[in-house]
């Protein structure tokens, strides 16, 4: 139930859905028969606010600023030895169970593949064993892709988790009998900070290993022109900012607590 509520809130609070709903409400007030002057003014204000905010989130100038807020973990320093017992790669970007281009084998999504690639790179560089954590679809895609495309085997699979909180909780249960408490945590750069807080809360010592760090282009006239990539990046950044805020609220109200 909580996952379903979260999914609904994501649709209602994040662009473009939230802003399109706002603009649609404004258009309805404007076009409604018998609408008074005040209702029409409110409608125009809602329509303008929805479209203007959508435009702002779709320009690189704004998406870059949001990205800097969301990406709070620096890249892993590869010049220093990594003090950890395992590498944990998080899901969160579901792949496909039957990809026709791979002869029906599982395949990872682009965002998930980025995490797998970096996790494999770190595994080869450090010699540490690898765990994958996510839904059954995500973990199957990750395990298949790692073995097929990168030649790195997965030692542990945690396939019960549906969100970041459960990633941390179920990984703690998986590793407790093994005495594994120090991990390298591989996930997308905008997700790393929130994920790290959840894993620390579950009792882990975490070495953050963000991947896909955004490097903003040079500012110019194009920085004020909307594009789909900037809107997608703004949406991802807002998702993580709101997700971390929700994590703090849940923790303060003791709604979700890691068993220790």
Model-derived regions: residue spans:
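Hydrophobic alpha-helical segments of integral membrane proteins
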Residues: 1-9, 62, 66-70, 238-245, ...
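Membrane-embedded alpha-helical segments of integral membrane proteins
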Residues: 1-32
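Extracytoplasmic/luminal low-complexity segments enriched in Pro/Gly and acidic/polar residues
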Residues: 221, 225, 245-260
